[in-house]
Amino acid sequence: MFFLPLFDDNPTGRWPLVTWALMAACIIVFFIQVSMTELQQIALWFEYGAVPAVIMGSASLPPSLEGLPPALTLISYVFLHGGWLHIAGNMLFLWIFGDNVEDRMGTIRFIIFYLICGAAASLSHVLISPNSTAPLIGASGAIAGVMAAYLLMFPRAKVRVIMVILIFIRWVHLPAFVVLISWLLLQIFAAPSSLSVEGGTAYFAHLGGFIAGLVLTPIFRKAGTPIWPKAETPPSWQIEPVPARQVKTEFIERYRRKKRVMVPQVKRDAPSQDKSNNPNNPWR
């Protein structure tokens, strides 16, 4: 069985400008990458990716590579990606979960939170594989922190997922905590296998970013935002499959930005001399 989240049923109260800016930055950098030759891309990954051995000081880049100071690559790596599926998956998860977290943190706090989670993810990877010379790239670790924040603040939000069971495809609603905890368990079970492989998926970076998100969310959330809020109404998660056309309609409604309704101000004139003699005049 396999399932992939597509969008949530959790509208926001503001434009997610930081989320969009982060997505735009990653996409722009990726298109710059694909315009390069393969050797140029690899050089870029070593210059701006987080290379554990270089960060720990046990190795150094060749003189021909002029990258950032090693400490800065703990953050710069989040804007690099290794392929179309890599960036598509990361941007999908940031699109789904980032806007709500930004809404509950605010613009400045959200971007600081995102970058700290990214740095925590790369540090986790460096500490687990200090002698690795493979560059760490991708926004997965930072987005894992965003997913942790979503789990704490919106555990019961409905997430529309596409579920594949053998040859059958179903569109169902699942609670956010089921989707996110399932993802977390997958990272935990897969992490040990990455210890014996140079390169590949950096599962410990994902776990490090997620843990950072759990720790930082209570600090970065807006005042009054509850952690794991109690359900005010009975859950209405839809387990029964629905047709694809309904999913399309739900998606459009979820991200449609309705015009703000302006409430007209009622101007009340001061009572005139003639009105003052009227017994029904409220100003009398």
Please identify what each model-predicted range represents.
Residues 1-271, 278-282:
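A detector for small-residue-rich transmembrane helices and their helix-helix packing motifs
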